[in-house]
Amino acid sequence: MGTQTLQMEKVKTLPVILGEVDILKTLQLLPGVQSSGEGNSGFYVRGGGPDQNLVLLDEATVYNSGHLFGFFSVFNSDAINSVTLIKGGMPAEYGGRLSSVVNVNMKEGNNQTYHATGGVGLIASRLTLEGPIQKGKSSFMMAARRTYIDALIKPFVSSTSTLSGSGYYFYDLNLKLNYQFSDKDRVFFSGYFGKDQFVFQGERFGIKFPWGNSTTTMRWNHLFNEKLFMNTTVLFSDYIFKIGASQSNFNFELFSGVRDYSTKVDFDYFPNIRNQVKFGGAYTFHTFTPTTATGTIGETSISPEKINRQYEKYVTKFK
């Protein structure tokens, strides 16, 4: 009862907002899940806050799962195969979270034929390509999405206006490659790159708000026998947030971010058809950069003597 898996074919049959299918908004329709605000992709699970949910994309942590200050999620529906929500009794392999685990899996691509899908919405368009690299053995999937809010607003702003350089947009890029070496070995690589960019440009004053996520996953699947299966995974996750301001000969920037390097090995053992035993271990090198300020006034630079970064290492074993 605490775990629910949704396939994208069913999710796409639900009504959508502004032409965009949103996985996280769909999860808000499930029992025990409540929206954090009207039209917002953040959600509460059994009383826990949105920041207490562990959001994973092909096992890599996504620290900010929203675009446009949470109005859209970062997950392009055309690139997603399924999403699993664990609301209670989270397995030890996830490292523990107070509220829930959202595990999103990307499509692996068709290894037989080529396909192209896309869509044009009110504020964003998307395109997905997939097909075989070596027929029957390897495949690829590439997906891109970009909003054109900046292009929609541009006709309403005069080219001579002091706000002509202002605007907002976001984009997502998804990539997945997989190769089957044998009946017992398979390797895949997946990556996600997304960014939001808000720019306000006045006659004498300008400000920029860029922020975004990047994730990378490399995994080796090995089948020892019909009862024992192994996954070896290397993960990278990065989130950055910046605020930049400029006026005349003055420039100022605030930067903060989170970066993870992880590796994990897990085994699945099936002693019989009714039981499954899962065990393994994981290591994470975690870097947290609190808000760091830099700036220039004319030819004078202002910067901290030392950037205050926090480094942490985690070693986890589970069974």
Say what each PLM segment does:
Residues M1-M90, V101, K107-E108:
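Periplasmic N-terminal accessory/gating domains of Gram-negative outer-membrane beta-barrel systems
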Residues Q7-E9, S65-G66, L85-I86, G109-Q112, ...:
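Extracytoplasmic loops and strand-loop junctions of Gram-negative outer membrane beta-barrel proteins
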Residues T13, G70, Y114-A116, T160-G165, ...:
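Outer-membrane beta-barrel domain signature
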Residues I23, S41, L98-S100, Y114-A116, ...:
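Hydrophobic, lipid-facing positions within transmembrane beta-strands of outer-membrane proteins
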Residues P50, A60-V62, K107, I123, ...:
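Structural signature of outer-membrane beta-barrel domains
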Residues Q52, D78, N111-T113, I133-K137, ...:
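Strand-connecting loop/turn motifs
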Residues L54, S82-E93, S99-K107, Y114-Q180, ...:
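Predominantly transmembrane beta-strands of Gram-negative outer membrane beta-barrel pores used
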Residues N178-K195, P210-K319:
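Face-selective signature of the C-terminal outer-membrane beta-barrel domain
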